[in-house]
Amino acid sequence: XTCESPSHKFKGPCATNRNCES
């Protein structure tokens, strides 16, 4: 999936998004 971090709206795979909170 995709994830959205509360700090910045990054949409992409959680595995490549270190700022994502799954």
From Swiss-Prot:
Record bears the keyword Transit peptide: no
Organism field: Spinacia oleracea
Gene3D superfamilies membership: Knottin, scorpion toxin-like (3.30.30.10)
Name of this protein: Defensin D1
Function: Antimicrobial peptide. Active against Gram-positive and Gram-negative bacterial pathogens.
InterPro entries membership: Scorpion_toxin-like_sf
SUPFAM superfamilies recorded: Scorpion toxin-like (SSF57095)
GO biological process: defense response to bacterium; defense response to fungus; killing of cells of another organism
